[in-house]
């Protein structure tokens, strides 16, 4: 499929995603954790995958908000349409789509794949966005000359840290955080690759 057609099919062939730019309010609230630290990331994503035996692709922007083990992920097309809102908490996960009832499950990855044709590894991204492996799960990692993660194989995914960036910290030296992350899942007949480019952080 050529690039222009991929852009025309940004909404993955799901008719509900081709409707007008409607905002999607999350139907699941964060579990209460008043002492948990909060962090937000914004950036761009692109995904290439196989659906019904055909190569497909989607791209857009994302907003990631986390508070402790609570996560909200918004996916938005280049035209400003909300593709999906994912909310994952210790008590469960919800996928909200435009003009559709909420979909609930213990984990959101399967819901995303069924509805959108691809799934971002939300559980792993809680740690991978911070440049670290998920604790309690087997992993193989390599590091660059500066001691930063270069590659990580964990939970069926290969994670490549392509670029890093400084993030300012008031009253302290800047720390290095990922700038670009490439993820690949080899699932036999349903491979999936995802590229994340993370916006610079502000103090």
Curated annotation (Swiss-Prot):
Mind telling me which PROSITE patterns this protein's record contains?
PROKAR_LIPOPROTEIN (PS51257)
Q: Has UniProt tagged this entry with the keyword Signal?
A: yes
> What CDD domains does its record include?
LolB (cd16326)
Q: Where is the lipid attached (N-palmitoyl cysteine)?
A: 21
Where it sits in the cell: the answer is:
Cell outer membrane
Q: Which GO terms describe its cellular component?
A: cell outer membrane
- Keyword annotations: Cell outer membrane, Chaperone, Lipoprotein, Membrane, Palmitate, Protein transport, Signal, Transport
Q: How does it assemble?
A: Monomer.
Functional summary from the UniProt entry: Plays a critical role in the incorporation of lipoproteins in the outer membrane after they are released by the LolA protein.
Name of the protein described by the UniProt record: Outer-membrane lipoprotein LolB
Which organism is this protein's natural source? Cupriavidus taiwanensis (strain DSM 17343 / BCRC 17206 / CCUG 44338 / CIP 107171 / LMG 19424 / R1) (Ralstonia taiwanensis (strain LMG 19424))
- In the UniProt record, the gene name given for this protein reads lolB
């Amino acid at each position: 499929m050529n690039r222009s057609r991929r852009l025309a099919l940004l909404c993955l062939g799901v008719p509900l995603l081709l409707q007008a730019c409607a905002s999607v309010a999350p139907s699941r609230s964060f579990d209460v954790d008043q002492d948990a630290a909060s962090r937000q990331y914004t950036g761009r994503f692109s995904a290439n995958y196989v659906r019904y035996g055909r190569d497909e692709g989607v791209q857009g922007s994302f907003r990631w908000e986390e508070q402790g083990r609570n996560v909200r992920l918004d996916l938005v097309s280049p035209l400003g349409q909300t593709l999906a809102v994912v909310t994952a908490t210790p008590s469960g996960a919800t996928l909200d789509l435009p003009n559709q009832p909420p979909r609930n499950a213990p984990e959101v990855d399967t819901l995303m794949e069924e509805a959108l044709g691809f799934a971002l590894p939300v559980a792993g991204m809680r740690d991978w966005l911070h440049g670290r492996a998920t604790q309690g799960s087997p992993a193989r990692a390599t590091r660059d000359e500066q001691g930063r993660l270069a590659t990580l194989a964990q939970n069926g995914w290969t994670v490549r840290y392509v670029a890093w960036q400084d993030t300012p910290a008031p009253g302290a030296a800047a720390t290095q955080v990922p700038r670009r992350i490439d993820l690949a899942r080899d699932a036999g007949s349903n491979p999936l690759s995802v590229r994340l480019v993370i916006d610079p952080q502000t103090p």
